[in-house]
């Protein structure tokens, strides 16, 4: 995966998180209360301002929404 692919994947992932939150009619403030993450952390995760959110933050975010995050470590065989 090159840098462009990584940037696109990162943006899509963040957009999907925000879309799921919005589809559940949940505000960032409500998600903050449930997840224990600050509102600014949630905003930064969704907007990309936090360049590398911790796995712990992503798990807390997803758990609060009742969704699972699957991570495939490795690449395609070439």
What are these regions (language model features)?
Residues 16, 41-44, 57:
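Residue-level recognition of specific faces of alpha-helices
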Residues 15-34, 60:
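Short basic helix-loop element that most often maps to the first helix and adjoining turn
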Residues 1-15, 68, 78:
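N-terminal flexible/basic segments that precede or flank functional cores
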């Amino acid at each position: 995966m090159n840098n462009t692919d990584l940037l696109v994947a990162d943006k899509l992932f963040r957009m999907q998180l925000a879309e799921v939150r919005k589809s559940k009619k949940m505000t960032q403030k409500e998600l903050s209360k449930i997840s224990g993450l600050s509102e600014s952390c949630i905003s930064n995760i969704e907007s990309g301002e936090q360049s590398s959110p911790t796995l712990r933050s992503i798990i807390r975010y997803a758990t609060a929404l009742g969704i699972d995050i699957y991570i495939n470590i490795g690449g395609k065989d070439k």
